[in-house]
């Protein structure tokens, strides 16, 4: 076993405009080739689009979208006696948020459209309205966990 002490998790710093850790975590997911300012501009433009379309505060729409996309359970492969079982496990809060952000950015990139900020805004609004690809992904994960409920006693 390693003698070195475990590192403490670094908390994401809040972003400069909305003072939200979630927005900063999203910035890191959007980031490409170290261009953080561009990633922030994409997010802030997306939030402006959300505010114009919904008339609500964009950060509240974003937070509700994250809550709705966050999975509660997932399946992990566990090898027992030569066969591999998909064992349903509860998702911790931080991992759930991370997965939600990852799915929202992934499906926003895959959308057809002109600008990334428009695609991101549409994906966030769809997630807040419980439609869209990221919500479908969450439901698919939950369905897999439900189907493999019989192997729940193999939890580790």
UniProtKB/Swiss-Prot annotation:
Subcellular location: Plastid, Chloroplast
Any one GO biological process: translation
Source organism, top-level taxon: Eukaryota
Keyword hit for Ribosomal protein: yes
Pfam families: Ribosomal_S7
Main location: plastid
Presence of the UniProt keyword Nucleotide-binding in the record: no
GO cellular component: chloroplast; small ribosomal subunit
Subunit record text: Part of the 30S ribosomal subunit.
Biological function: One of the primary rRNA binding proteins, it binds directly to 16S rRNA where it nucleates assembly of the head domain of the 30S subunit.
Name of the protein in its database record: Small ribosomal subunit protein uS7c
Organism: Guillardia theta
Lineage: Eukaryota, Cryptophyceae, Pyrenomonadales, Geminigeraceae, Guillardia
Gene: rps7
């Amino acid at each position: 076993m390693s003698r070195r002490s475990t590192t403490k998790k670094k908390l994401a710093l809040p972003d400069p405009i909305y003072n939200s850790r979630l927005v900063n975590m999203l910035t890191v997911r959007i980031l490409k080739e170290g261009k953080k300012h561009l990633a922030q501009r994409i997010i802030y433009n997306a939030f402006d689009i959300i505010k114009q379309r919904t008339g609500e505060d964009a950060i509240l729409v974003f937070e509700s979208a994250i809550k709705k996309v966050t999975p509660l359970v997932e399946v992990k492969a566990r090898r027992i006696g030569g066969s591999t079982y998909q064992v349903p496990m509860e998702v911790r809060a931080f991992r759930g948020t991370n997965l939600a952000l990852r799915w929202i950015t992934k499906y926003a990139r895959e959308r057809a459209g002109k600008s990334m900020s428009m695609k991101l805004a549409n994906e966030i609004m769809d997630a807040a309205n419980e439609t869209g690809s990221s919500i479908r992904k969450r439901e698919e994960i939950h369905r897999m966990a439900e189907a493999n409920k019989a192997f729940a006693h193999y939890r580790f």
